[in-house]
Amino acid sequence: MLRTSIATSRQLLSSPVCPKASAQWLRSSNAGRANTTTRRYYAIQQEPNGALRSSLSPSAAAVSDVSQRASNSTNTKRPNTSDLNVRSPASPSTGSTLKPETVLVAPVSPLRQGQSSPGSAAPAPEPAAAPPPSPPPPPPAPKTGRLRKFLLYLFLTTGLAYAGGVWYSLRSDNFYDFFTEYAPYGENAVIYLEERDFRNRFPNATKKNNRRAVAPRDEGAQVTIPGGSGLSWKVAEEQQEGSDISKKGPHMSAVDNNKATKDTKTVEKTKGGVTSKSPAQKEEAVKTKPAPEGVKTQPAKVAETPREPAIPAITTIDHLVLNTEDEPVVQDLVKVFNDIITVISADAPSSFSGPVAKAKEELEKIGKRILALKSDAQASAQKEINDAHASFDKSAANLIRHIDEMRAEDATKFREEFEAERERIAQSYQEKINTELQRAHEVAEQRLRNELVEQAIELNRKFLSDVKNLVEHERESRLSKLAELVSSVAELERLTAGWSNVIDINLKTQQLQVAVDAVRTTLENSNVPRPFIRELAAVKELASNDEVVSAAIDSISPVAYQRGIPSSAHLVDRFRRVATEVRKASLLPENAGITSHAASFVLNKVMLKKHGSPAGNDVESTLTRAENFLEEGNLDEAAREMNSLKGWAKLLSKDWLADVRRVLEVKQALEVIETEARLRCLQVE
């Protein structure tokens, strides 16, 4: 920005406001290019020449404003080569709407006048016009942020889809299996939500599960009490054996031998860790323990009074026992209450003995009430059962009576229907018998009538034959001669009709033979292929009812009788031309290139032509044999020889083989037609 302001100030002080007219019109063409090459752009857009306007006079500012308006429609001047950073003043172009005469001339500032002496001959420099302001830089292209939007939408869509999948997994088991198997961390998310839902629905469930179970207290290590310690009524020698209290015995249990419950727990001493024995247990243990050998027990001289133990015996609360084995609900309630008693006995039995006793009484009352309710319910149920049995018995009796009545009615009805059906069947059979008898009488009468008619006819025939014999005998057999004459005339008529058919068949056969000869003559006498559609149509018309002739004509290719077939001489001449080309390509492989064609052409020049009937499957031998067959007139064998060629030789002779096939097809069809005509003549004879 500093360099631009300095260059602008220099341009204002050095260049005139209105340049010369000649320079304007001469440099107008190059002004646009110079302006585009020297124009500078900055990121921060500021008002051009703002600092300069503040320091210049108001007249200079006005001039700069006018020049700025004029520069919007004009091009800039090409910069001087001596200073590329200084912009040239604006020069009006031919298309400018502001004329140079309308530009205001800025007055000379006092500072410039003071610098020039009054007597100097040099004219004072004119104040320079304000340079054209640089056009505002184009606004920067707004950032589209497509990648940011795409990532944001993708993240939101993925999150919504994942949340929807978790939500739907809680509703559908099938989708739960799919989501937990394929979605990452899907199973953890679903399990977490299920746990949260469970905690919200059952807030007290976790508290019960988190309660620590009462674990048995650690009894510590085994403690051995010396033999001389403790109180005993026996002598000291008897304490040698069994001084270890870790062995099994009654002393291992610190509670009474109350066998009513199985869940009683021992209460241990918190600091000493050694269980104390009650006097009764000690006496019982001493009585059950056998005396060691060699030591004789002596009766105590003075009976010692039992002393109270240092630690008072622990009192326990008796368990609740109710005789309700057949009530599982009551038994479960008693079991739960006994468990509570066991826990209380282990902790502080004396504190809760009163409430427990009261609870026992209430539970006993509840048990008795339940038993009473059960007995009442059983009694009412038994009464209802008895009433139901009575009603069922009554209903069964009524039902049985009703069934018996219905059975009797059905039996009566069935008997009546049976009698009516029996009468109807007997009547129908009687009618059938009467009908059969009547028909038998009619048949017998008709048979007798027919026999009488036959006898009458036979008598009439005998009478006629007798009359005929008598007439013949009287007229000397004239009637028999007339009969013979009639039969002879009929035979002559039959023979005449048969010979007329023979004559017609012979005439058609001759006409067919003439038509076939016309076709053959047309084919043999034509030097060039000529159509023979009319001749073939005449043959088909004469043998319209003969299937063999029609099949032979249909076997001829339409191309053959529409375009004609070549003659034998034409085929021989064409064969010789084809044979020349085939010999040139006789040495070519199937996938031959230009080199192979050239080599085959050169080698063909030095090959010797075979004569006679050479043996072999090479191209030259095959061509020689085919040529011999053509000279003999055997087109069939020549075509067979040419058809045995392979590769380029067969490809080159393909057209010649097609012509030969058409010729052979036509000749074969004509031979079949001639044979059929001869066969007709033989059949007539």
Swiss-Prot record:
InterPro entries: MIC60
Coiled-coil intervals: 356-379, 405-456
Biased composition (Polar residues): 68-99
FT transit peptide: 1-19
Gene name of the encoded protein: MIC60
Protein name per UniProt: MICOS complex subunit MIC60
Compositional bias ranges of the Pro residues kind: 124-142
Disulfide pattern: none
Subunit structure: Component of the mitochondrial contact site and cristae organizing system (MICOS) complex.
GO cellular component: MICOS complex
Annotated localization: Mitochondrion inner membrane
Region annotation (Disordered) ranges: 49-144, 209-305
Membrane spanning residue stretches: 150-169
Family listed: Belongs to the MICOS complex subunit Mic60 family.
Tree of life domain: Eukaryota
Keyword line: Coiled coil, Membrane, Mitochondrion, Mitochondrion inner membrane, Transit peptide, Transmembrane, Transmembrane helix
Functional description taken from the UniProt entry: Component of the MICOS complex, a large protein complex of the mitochondrial inner membrane that plays crucial roles in the maintenance of crista junctions, inner membrane architecture, and formation of contact sites to the outer membrane. Plays a role in keeping cristae membranes connected to the inner boundary membrane. Also promotes protein import via the mitochondrial intermembrane space assembly (MIA) pathway.
A Pfam entry, by short name: Mitofilin
PANTHER family assigned to the protein according to its UniProt record, in alphabetical order: MICOS COMPLEX SUBUNIT MIC60 (PTHR15415:SF7), MITOFILIN (PTHR15415)
Composition bias, Basic and acidic residues: 259-271
Membrane topology listed for this record: Single-pass membrane protein
Biased composition (Low complexity): 51-67
Gene Ontology BP, a term: cristae formation
Organism (species): Paracoccidioides brasiliensis (strain Pb18)
Segments on the Mitochondrial matrix face: 20-149
Mitochondrial intermembrane side: 170-685
